[in-house]
Structures are given as C-alpha cells and as structure tokens.
C-alpha cells in the first residue's frame, strides 16, 4: 500500500487513486482545438466565434486589439470598431491550467456612420450650436501676432464654405486680426474618423490649423489634456503639411511630429483625416497616411476631444511674417465625424 500511495503522489498530474488500489484518468491537457469564425456581411464589425476542444472547461479570446475575454462555453460575439486584419488568439484551458492555443487572422471591414458634421451651407455667421470663439491677442503661448475676433470681417460662411480671414490691420494693440473657432462645450467625442475638406491660406507667416484638445483642459491644463494637430501649415513652406501629437513628455518642440508634401495646398481643396481608436491614431491627407501614434491607457487620447479651427500669424511655428502680407483666407468645406 505504501508503494501505491507514493506512486499516486508523484503521479498527481497523470493519475488518481481509488479505494481498490486502481487508478482513473485525471484532467487531461486540452486537445483538438477548433475555432469557427463568422464575420457578419453587413460591415458592422460584428464577428461570431465558436471554439471547441476536448478536455477544455474555458476559452480565452485575445481579439488582437488589446481586448481579452474569458468564455466558458467557447461561443461569443465581438464587435470591432475599425477595419483591419486582426490576429485573434484563442486559448482552451482545463481546470488545472493546462492549455492549447490557436491563432486565426480575421479580416474585418467596418463602415462607419456619420454622427456629426458642419457642412457650412447656411450663409452668414457660423452655426452657434456648433462653434464658439477664442477672443484676444495675448500671443496664445506661442508669440503669435494676431488678435482673434468673432467679427464678420474675420469669420463668415458663404458659397458653402467657412471662411476664416487673417488681415493686416491695427486692432486692440495687435498688427493682425484673425479668428479661432472651437466646439468646446458644444460638441466633443471619443474615437472615430474625422474628415475636414479645406483649402489653406497663402502668405508667408500664416499658420492655419485643424486641431483638437481634450475636454478636461480646464482642470488638468495643457499638455496633460492632450492635443491632436490633424493639420498645421507654415505659409513659408507652401505645400508641406505637418501633424503633431502633444502630451506629457512629448510636447512643444518635443512633440510627436511628422510631415508630408502635397500639391496645390493653397489653391485646391484637400481632405485631412484622423482615424482614432483605443489602439492607434492615424493622420492622412487625401487618404495618404503620413503620421501614426500608437494609443494606450497611459496617454490622454482615450477621452472626449473638441475641435479648433484657426489661422495664427507668425509665432513660434508660423515664423516671420512677410511685410507685404495684407490678407489670407482659410476655406473649410466641411467637418465630419464618423463612428
């Protein structure tokens, strides 16, 4: 009997003893893992997974986007929020932790729906339900030379586009005027696709921007709130487009920046796009990707953000202003958000 007991102890992972001195199989390592995947054909992002295995009591799904889920039955439906080829790892486990895994690549196409837009199709002042204004001429932390107003001389809608006009004129102690619109307190969102169709102003010293700031800027300040520069442009670099991400540790001159070159930036309309989710942020012009930032929970890009549209003059980015500059117009055809 002592020999039998000793055998049972050293063989615990393989056999168990019964009263008659025989043995019965213990929980065995899972085998025969099969994963059936059904991608819904409506481009909704919904995917059905059915996993089966011998000797498995639970199934863990790594959806390939940083999301994990444990499912006892092995059957689960998951909704992806953006298109991509996702490497999904399925692990079948038994009660003792023994496991077997399989990885399948799941191609997903997600058709996003338009959830908010301003088409700028009503002439006059911009829609006050969508836009407010920053007013003043304090340099705005960048040694800028303009005074921002909400006057019709500096901002108006006509012919189906928003016009932001920078002018050389003495006003409130500044040598230039312009406008800066923002959707703060009126519209903000987290994740999705942004498209802005715009024609940039011409003139050395102009600094137009399409950008976003975190809703919590009033409580945590910049750069803790995060900043997304979808498009910035120096008038001295006619067709060079800049995108930047500012956040703690990487801001100002140390921001995450990239550039691209396009044709006719100031004479033709181009579509500036941000694709933003919990895993990545992609910026493109006319569907040409040129700037990417991996997203994660340690940086401030998992909260509500609002829009800003403006022309600055000079400053740390815009540089020296051409003495012959008189006026320049930033035209925006639409701002659209898809989710």
Residue spans of the language-model regions?
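Sec-dependent bacterial lipoprotein signal peptides
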Residues: 1-16
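GH16 jelly-roll
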Residues: 17-50, 58-63, 70-79, 83-96, ...
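Sequence context surrounding c-type heme c attachment/ligation sites in exported
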Residues: 55
């Amino acid at each position: 009997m002592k020999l039998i007991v000793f055998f049972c102890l050293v063989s615990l992972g393989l056999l168990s003893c019964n009263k008659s001195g025989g043995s019965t199989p213990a929980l065995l390592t899972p085998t025969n893992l099969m994963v059936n995947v059904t991608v819904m054909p409506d481009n909704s992002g919904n995917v059905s997974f059915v996993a089966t295995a011998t000797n498995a009591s639970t199934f863990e799904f790594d959806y390939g986007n940083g999301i994990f889920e444990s499912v006892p039955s092995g059957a689960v439906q998951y909704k992806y929020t953006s298109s991509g080829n996702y490497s999904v790892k399925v692990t079948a486990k038994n009660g003792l932790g023994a496991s077997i895994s399989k990885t399948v690549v799941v191609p997903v196409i997600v058709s996003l729906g338009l959830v908010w837009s301003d088409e700028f199709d009503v002439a006059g002042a911009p829609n006050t339900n969508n836009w407010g204004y920053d007013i003043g001429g304090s340099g705005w932390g960048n040694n800028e030379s303009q005074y921002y107003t909400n006057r019709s001389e500096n901002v108006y809608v006509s012919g189906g586009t928003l016009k932001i006009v920078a002018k050389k004129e003495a006003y409130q102690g500044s040598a230039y005027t312009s406008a800066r619109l923002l959707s703060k307190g009126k519209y903000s969102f987290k994740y999705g696709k942004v498209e802005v169709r715009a024609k940039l102003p011409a003139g050395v010293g102009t600094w137009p921007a399409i950008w976003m700031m975190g809703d919590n800027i009033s409580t945590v300040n910049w750069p803790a709130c995060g900043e997304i520069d979808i498009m910035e442009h120096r008038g001295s670099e006619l067709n060079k487009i800049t995108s930047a991400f500012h956040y703690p540790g990487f801001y100002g001159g140390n921001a995450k920046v990239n550039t691209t070159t396009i044709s006719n930036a100031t004479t033709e309309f181009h579509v500036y796009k941000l694709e933003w989710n919990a895993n990545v942020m992609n910026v493109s012009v006319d569907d040409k990707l040129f700037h990417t930032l991996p997203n994660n929970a340690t940086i401030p890009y998992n909260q509500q953000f609002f829009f800003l549209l403006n022309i600055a003059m000079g400053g740390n980015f815009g540089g020296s202003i051409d003495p012959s500059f008189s006026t320049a117009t930033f035209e925006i055809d639409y701002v659209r958000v898809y989710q």
